From Swiss-Prot:
Its EC number is 1.4.4.2. This is Probable glycine dehydrogenase (decarboxylating) subunit 2. The gene is gcvPB. One of its GO terms (biological process) is glycine decarboxylation via glycine cleavage system. It comes from the Bacteria. Belongs to the GcvP family. C-terminal subunit subfamily. The glycine cleavage system catalyzes the degradation of glycine. The P protein binds the alpha-amino group of glycine through its pyridoxal phosphate cofactor; CO(2) is released and the remaining methylamine moiety is then transferred to the lipoamide cofactor of the H protein. It comes from Endomicrobium trichonymphae. Signal peptide: none annotated. PANTHER family: GLYCINE DEHYDROGENASE (DECARBOXYLATING), MITOCHONDRIAL, GLYCINE DEHYDROGENASE, DECARBOXYLATING.
Amino acid sequence: MEKLLNELSSENRPAYSVDSDVEIDAQIPENLKRSSGLGLPSITENDLSRHFTNLSRKNYALSTSFYPLGSCTMKYNPLINERVAKNEAFNFIHPYQPGKSMQGVLKIMYELEKDLCEISGMDCFSLQQAAGAHGEFTGLLIIAKYFKSIKQKRTKIIIPDTAHGTNPASAALAGFGTVSLKSESDGSILPEKLKKILTPEIAAVMLTVPNTLGAFEKNIPEISRIVHENGSLLYYDGANLNAVMGIVRPGDMGFDVMHINLHKTFSTPHGGGGPGSGPVGVKEFLEPFLPVPKIESRKSKFVLNYKKPKSIGKLKAFLGNFPVILKAYVYIKSLGAEGLKNVSEWAVLNANYMLARFKDKIDVPAGSRCMHEFVLSPKSLFKNNVKTLDVAKRLLDYGYYAPTIYFPLIVEEAVMLEPTETESKETMDAFIDTLIKIIYEEATQEPQKLKEAPFNTSVRRLNEVEAARNPVLKWKKA
C-alpha cells in the first residue's frame, strides 16, 4: 500500500531551496509568526512525482477495463470532449464576468437547453444543477412552488420500490413525505394499485423509466391519465435515459418534470464525487418556477434574466458545472439525432446479449428481456454461506470493477449490470465467463477463497462495519 505524504516526509530533507540575499524570517514581525509549524510534509519533487504516479497506476477507469456498474452508465467518454473543454477560450473565462463578455458560453448553454428539449419532449430547461439528486431536489421544489401558487396543499410524493435510490431522500429534503408503491414481479406498476393511494395529498408520482430492474414501464399512458385526473404531477427520473434516446420522449408520455444526468447519458467522466450535471426540464406551465438566472435570446444577444418572480431561486453558484455542460454539448453535436438513437439501440442490444447468456444459469427476477441494464439474483446458487459481496470482491482479482450489488433492494443478493453501448462482444463474453466461473466453480469448490478475496489488490478486504462505525478520516502523527 502506498504510504501517505506525511509518512514519506523527513524533517532533515529540504523540499526546495531558494538562493536569497534577504533573511526572509527576519522580515516578518514577531506578532505575525506562527508559534508552531504547519505540519506540512517535507518531500523532494522527485519523490512527490513518484508518489502520485504510483497512485495513478492503482486507478481503475474506463480507459483501463470494463466498468459494468449498474444504474451508472459508465460508457466511454470520447476524448474530443476533453480537448474542447480544455480550450483556453473556455478555461480563461471567469464566472463573474458580465454576460456581454461571454456570449459564446451563453450561446452554448442556450443551444444545449434547446437540444435537451428536443431529446426529452420538455419545453424548458435549467442547466444549473450539479448532479442527478440535485436535479431531483430542484424538480420537487418546482412542484412544491407550483402547488403553493395555486393554493393547493399537497404534501406527499409516491415513489415505487423500483425507483432510483435517491428519490426518497430528495423528496424528504424538499419537505415532502413519501408513500411507497410496491411493484409487480416484473417491476411494473399496476395502475389499479396506484389509483388506490392517489389521494388529494399527493403532489407527484416519481417514476424511473426504464426502472431499476431494467424494465420499461408498460402502463405509462394509463398511469399518466390517472395521476393527472387526481391533479397530481408526473416526475421522470432521467437516470436511465440512455435506453430510450430517439425512441420515446418523456414529455410525449405525459411527464411534467424531469432531470437528465449529463454525466451519464451524455458521456462526461464521473464517479469519485463528481463533477456532475443534472439539468431539469419542465412543461411550459412550470417554466416560471425554474431557477434563476434564465438564459434568454434577445435581439441576437444572450442575456441572464434574474427577474422571475415565481422562480424557486438560485440553487448553485454561477451557472452550473460548465465543463460538464460543454462536454455534453460536444457529444450531442458530434452524434446528432440519429447517432443518439443508435446509442440507445446499442445499449439495449448489449444488455440483452449479456442477459441472454446469463438467464439459463442465474435467476433473473424481471424476465428474459431488458432495456439497458438488468438484475441477477444468484442467491439460489450460493452454498457454504457465500454472498454476492464475496463474488464482487473476487471479481476484483480478475481485473474487473465489481457491478452494483444489493440494489435494487427488492431483489435478494442482487447483481446489477449495465454494459452500455460502447463495449464489444469479446469484452462482454470475457466478463460473463468470469462471473459464471466464480459463481459455479469457485463458490462451490473454494468458498473460503471467495470470502477472503480480493488477493491481488493493493488493499485487501476491509472491515466495512468497523470502518462505518469508527471511521479514521485523518492522519495523526504517531
